[in-house]
Amino acid sequence: MFYKILHLLPLILLVACTTQLTPPMSKAIMTNADRIQPYAQNPFYWQYKGVPVLLLGGSVEDNLFQIADIEAHLDLLHSIGGNYVRCTMSSRDEGDAWPFARDANTGLYNLEAPGEEYWTRFERFLKLCAARDIVLQIELWDRFDFAREPWQDNPYNPKNNTNYSLEESGLKEAINSHPGAKESAFFRSVPALENNEVILRYQRAQIDELLKRALPYPNVLYCMDNETNESPEWGKYWALYIKAKAGDALVQTTEMWDAWDLQSAQHRHTLDHPELYAFFDLSQNNHRPANEHWANPQLIRQYIIDSGQIRPMNSVKIYGANTGRFGNGRDGQERFWRNIFGGLATSRFHRPDSGLGLGAIAQAHIRSLRDLTDQIDIFTCTPHNDLLTERGWNEAYCTANPGVEYALFFPDGGNILLDVEAAEGEKLSVRWLDIRQSTWQDEVNTTAENQLNLVTPKEEGYWAVVVKVME
């Protein structure tokens, strides 16, 4: 498996190849063939450095480049088989830097001058991720920075900068509503909407600073927003802007919509425009429970197949923690596995308190799912709950290449029948994985008939099993 090879590479190799944090585009680190892109043989997945890669992750923050101990955090993720992080370009937490320079005497920002600390942190983050072959999914704009309390500290607020006034910018000094109320003119600056060049020139300058650092790296995915409900013209503008700036370099873009319902018209603005968006992020489906959480992506998967434009489906944030509001810890753990068994290309635990982050529970699941997918060729498997009978509503989930190999996930023990007719007469190996302990049970061999009865070693707990035709 590609990940195992990467895991053994000395982390200093990439660092030794570059003498600066941000290589110029003329000396890009990787050729297009090595950049992250849909897998040529199965575009529902990603390929990186020319080979398929399954992206798994979790982290303590969403704007991960801002944290102090980032290197140790990435080392931990890498050590357990993780290779995927989220990177909102957000600044609203205590201790975060903003993307513009601030005058220490006046306390005002100059939107003509980049913020050195902010961009230094981002450059370092890019370098550290690349050295560990960790893919980062950037979100250019996080709407929660532009309303309520964070807006009071935001450099774009006219009261906080020396570049424009309230009247000149059309921006409000106070926005007390949830950003979903769309009170801010910030997200209407593009030509197709209000064509507000007073703001837009500085927005472009900020994205230029981001791109001159990020584009040379091959391991970056670009998402326009965090759970937006703004006009699709906003995301369209920035997707086209990134593509224009990238030139001949391959870039992968998407938009993340606010709607929890994947059938919402919002999501069609991504799904129906593959010329703009190379992948679909369905993170908001992680508000859904149990079998519903499984069923919704299957409808989207079929919609993508019917479109003739196969693309990866990503899940960059999985809600669910006992400390949060969007499902409990069990929900988060189950969703992590259902995503991958349901055919998604990525699965990542959201930061606390709404997700499990990279705590001990998340670590066990990342390690175990990586162990399991290293035992099968996940890139040739497809969701196959149709092969399960005598199955409870949320009892088991199956991905398979029928006649070759099968993998099942049990959220809380179980006893089901697996249709192995495609392998009838063949010898099968059966091996159980205790997910919480990240340990395998001894292999058991049997002969395939029409159905195989699979009973978890214990009546409760998170279990997975791999069934393979023996050579």
Residue spans for each PLM region:
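Sec-dependent signal peptide recognition
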Residues: 2-11
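N-terminal low-complexity, Pro/Thr/Ser-rich intrinsically disordered segments
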Residues: 23-36
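Active-site mouth of glycoside hydrolases
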Residues: 33-35, 40-277, 289
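Extracellular glycoside hydrolase catalytic/binding regions
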Residues: 202-205, 216-363
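Aromatic- and carboxylate-lined catalytic core of secreted/periplasmic carbohydrate-active enzymes
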Residues: 312, 320-323, 328-444, 455-471
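Short strand-edge motifs at loop-to-beta-strand transitions and within beta-strands
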Residues: 450-452
